[in-house]
Design a protein with these regions (language model features):
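Conserved phosphate/ATP/ADP-binding segment of small-molecule kinases
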Residues: 112-155
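Acidic active-site catalytic centers that drive phospho-/nucleotidyl reactions
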Residues: 7, 17, 99, 133-136
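Conserved phosphate-binding/catalytic loop of the ribokinase/pfkB sugar-kinase fold
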Residues: 47-52, 104-124
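Active-site-proximal alpha-helical scaffold in enzymes
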Residues: 14
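Short, glycine-rich nucleotide/cofactor-binding loops
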Residues: 4-11
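Conserved N-terminal subdomain of the carbohydrate kinase-like
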Residues: 1-2, 18-98, 102-105
Length: 155
């Protein structure tokens, strides 16, 4: 089950997750956390989906289907991060993979400091695997840390 915002170009976000999961012969279950306005040049806007709707989407599927893993991408809001953390409490045996999307590939900031703090406190401790790129890793740990070994220990 993947939690992420949409990307109408399918180059990232929920659509890319669905394509990737399907290419691995798995059934992609997708929870919309936000709707982006973007093209191949950059992100022009992002609207978070209401956390209650994220909760309802997720719990409806979890009541019907078994899943093998959770994957978090761009979550859209602190409220969405909180509700996803609450859902994960009910499924501690299911591994959580986090791709901490902090900015678009072109550098458009997508996560504020409050959202980053919520991810670090509420989701990272529950994670099985975290997949930041080097820029995300530096931002998550500390701006001045250039040692990748130290970054991996800190994360």
């Amino acid at each position: 089950m993947t939690f992420s915002a949409t990307d109408a170009t399918s180059g990232a976000g929920l659509q890319a997750d669905v394509l990737t999961i399907a290419s691995l012969n798995c059934n992609p279950l997708s929870i919309v956390t936000g709707v982006s306005v973007q093209d191949t040049i950059g992100v022009r806007g992002l609207t978070a989906i209401n956390a209650e709707l994220v909760n309802d989407q997720t719990r409806t599927i979890l009541g019907d289907m078994e899943i093998s893993a959770f994957k978090c991408g761009l979550l859209g809001s602190v409220e969405n991060i909180r509700i996803i953390a609450e859902i994960l409490e009910d499924y501690p045996e299911i591994p959580l993979i986090i791709d901490p999307v902090l900015a678009s590939g072109r550098g458009d900031e997508l996560v504020n400091e409050e959202m980053m703090k919520a991810m670090l406190e509420l989701l990272f401790p529950k994670s099985y695997l975290i997949t930041p790129n080097s820029h995300e890793a530096r931002r998550l740990v500390s701006e001045g840390n250039e040692n990748f070994e130290d970054l991996s220990i800190d994360l």
